[in-house]
């Protein structure tokens, strides 16, 4: 079974379509390793709340770094002190392991 720790240690694999989205049962098992994340249809979703705008924007920049390294990019909705992150794999119209890998990497960033 995947844990958040070992998901964060994995690398995303390029996905250009041609595979099926994760089955709901597999996505549910992976979701259990990611505290605070929810499934919103075929999207992985979490809102992070920070003490101020500076911290929220610093986190957005950290997300950009992870996204660039993994070549897997979330939808971001940025508020004054909050950042909503939504992952899904556009090429397959649903969830892939890449979504969970990136979510786990974001969780690891905040383990301070």
UniProtKB/Swiss-Prot annotation:
PANTHER family recorded: PTERIN-4-ALPHA-CARBINOLAMINE DEHYDRATASE
Which GO biological-process labels does this protein carry?
tetrahydrobiopterin biosynthetic process
Q: Which CDD domains match?
A: PCD_DCoH_subfamily_a (cd00913)
Tell me which family the UniProt entry assigns to this protein: Belongs to the pterin-4-alpha-carbinolamine dehydratase family.
Q: What class of enzyme is it?
A: lyase
Q: In its UniProt entry, what is this protein called?
A: Putative pterin-4-alpha-carbinolamine dehydratase
The record's catalysed reaction(s) read: (4aS,6R)-4a-hydroxy-L-erythro-5,6,7,8-tetrahydrobiopterin = (6R)-L-erythro-6,7-dihydrobiopterin + H2O
Concerning Pfam families, the annotation shows: Pterin_4a (PF01329)
Q: What is a single molecular function from GO for this protein?
A: 4-alpha-hydroxytetrahydrobiopterin dehydratase activity
Please provide the record's keywords in A-Z order. Answer: Lyase
For this protein, the Enzyme Commission number is: 4.2.1.96
Name the lineage: Bacteria, Pseudomonadati, Pseudomonadota, Betaproteobacteria, Rhodocyclales
Record InterPro entries? PCD_sf (IPR036428), Pterin_deHydtase (IPR001533)
